């Protein structure tokens, strides 16, 4: 940043130096010299420098902060020869709010805080140190986190087509690692995680710092890493195998990584070690305790790519990205933040293991049948705070007294929870039948030591109850005795002086004083010492008052320090139990999710699906879980679906009018499959669900302006991905393939895609289309069936029945939809005229009905097809008749 980049209002007032590196250091004031020295070490972060009650920024950081936070940009004298330099500041008590805004915009922040008071300072400057570096992926502060979302930091190592991935949420302690082959899998895993920050090793020395979302990526970052994330480019050294392994072994005090499951996964180890190094560098003394890394494989879970997650609107809507209207919105009846985060993870990682699915079903079934147990459980869970993050802040040394009280209250609920679930039969609920007794003891100890309503600040006293420590009680008694002496001083001095308006007061600047009106000042005794003269007031002190003040202030300082030390001891005690607390928190979160899913199942009338080992998908009277909640009760029209059985089709060609509900039906089937594989009940009268390895969707498309791809090219890319990766155990949901190009081209592509899916892949597929010619496929392939969304035709309009029934539709009623949308009547009339001519002359399917490998058909010659096409084009657009 150059001087010319200074804002105009600063440039006009002789404010110079838009960058601290432009200034000769020996010309700066001592404080500014220290600021510049610290800034040299943190060029890639915004430096927030504590000065009294404010965190200040200077030079280039001040300009950035003022711009991004819309704060007033002012200036400060930096030295006689330097003049004024840019300055912006935020109140120290509002740090979380402003830091959160900067982090959301992709900035990293270095906190340079005062580590001693002015009274403790040995020299002219109060000692300041970097106490914390806040980056998007390393946030611990409660006010900067979303309660029901994880805040993941990820690290990636790539070697050819092989990759290693580690990710952690330092606020909850989650720490996972994986290794696989195929960069597309890495891309999709990052999309699933939505990490706030991604670490990537780079040897380029000039690429340090954060790349914010949307910034152009340097060549060192491969194309498989999406532009939508924030990247921190790191030195390769911590990502070297030996360095990374050693760091993991030392940090977790292990002899090998066998127990973590990654001993034979070198890329996973490198990613995990590089991530741990970054956390140590950024969190310094407040490094949050992490669980030992756990290893997982992509093959353990149903694969949902980014396209499918978006089309099925699992966590946010496709239209505006809002939570309201998503599947998560429809299901989230969890009572705790931990449960909310876990439900999100379950929805994004459906299971493939039938036994694990059935275990969840068993717990939900028990909670559905025992309504009293379910309601009591949910009421109790509502009183439990976020055990994961509370214990994490305690372990990191950042928890305040209110955090520990919330933790204590939650820990003391656990025995009650164990008693409530003592009669539970399902293994997932039985996990909470035994609670470690030391957690109840810890909760008792915290409640007995901390006052009921402690302040947020830890260094100003008022934290610890009386009776906890003898020394504390003695100090309090001394302070109280001296304060009572001062309180009685006003009455005794009024009597002694005869001045009834005399008052005893206190100010931070001058301490305790005796106040008199100036008209009475000549009546004061000789031992009064004048301290301050104001317009209408004189302030005095006495030797006794000064002595008492000194005793009070010294005792209060000692008292505050002792309370703080006792609190730190309590917090340290909690940190020794973090692993145990988090283990029980995992079980509590699971119980919360299971109870929430049971609540939805009961009130929305869901059924328990039969999980099968074959490919069958049989849904009787299925419903869309989100749409039915948005409609009045009973308004949603249920529909059935059968795919993958010996008697049923593998591919359904679904036809019907515009706006009749085809896309809703596709999503409904996909969501029921997904819900079944997270162990949930499903919105249907009955359901048999075979395990699915992957759900593919291609529903709607828009131009990708960022890459210059048209709607049709986006559609073809997505379709190619499906055809190249689908298996017989996949579920494929396609809507209007081929619509983005010319009619003949689109129909040809749609036919070929449907034929390939049914004949070659044999994936369970629903193929929604307006190409009614595709109904011919059912006569050529035994595993294809035609279904339609029905309408009722009235003389002047049509009524959408939203019922899916066997058979193919021969009309789309697009002109009727256009009329309902309000197109001018002359346009509608002309469209009907053109349509009648097309229907009269069209033989588009002549080539498709003949051939296609069928022994019952003969192949049409090119000349026949050309003649047909020419006939169709004659007279269609010759103008309206009169």
From Swiss-Prot:
PROSITE patterns noted in UniProt: DNA_MISMATCH_REPAIR_2
Transmembrane segments: none
Keyword ATP-binding assigned: yes
GO molecular function, one term: damaged DNA binding
UniProt entry keywords in alphabetical sequence: ATP-binding, DNA damage, DNA repair, DNA-binding, Nucleotide-binding
Residues annotated to bind ATP: 656-663
GO cellular component, one term: cytosol
BP GO annotations: mismatch repair
Presence of keyword Repeat: no
Domain of life where this protein originates: Bacteria
UniProt cross-references to InterPro entries, sorted A to Z: DNA_mismatch_repair_MutS, DNA_mismatch_repair_MutS-lik_N, DNA_mismatch_repair_MutS/MSH, DNA_mismatch_repair_MutS_C, DNA_mismatch_repair_MutS_clamp, DNA_mismatch_repair_MutS_core, DNA_mismatch_repair_MutS_N, DNA_mismatch_repair_MutS_sf
Functional summary from the UniProt entry: This protein is involved in the repair of mismatches in DNA. It is possible that it carries out the mismatch recognition step. This protein has a weak ATPase activity.
Similarity remark: Belongs to the DNA mismatch repair MutS family.
Xref: NCBIfam families: mutS1, PRK05399.1
Protein known as: DNA mismatch repair protein MutS
Lineage: Bacteria, Bacillati, Cyanobacteriota, Cyanophyceae, Synechococcales
Gene: mutS
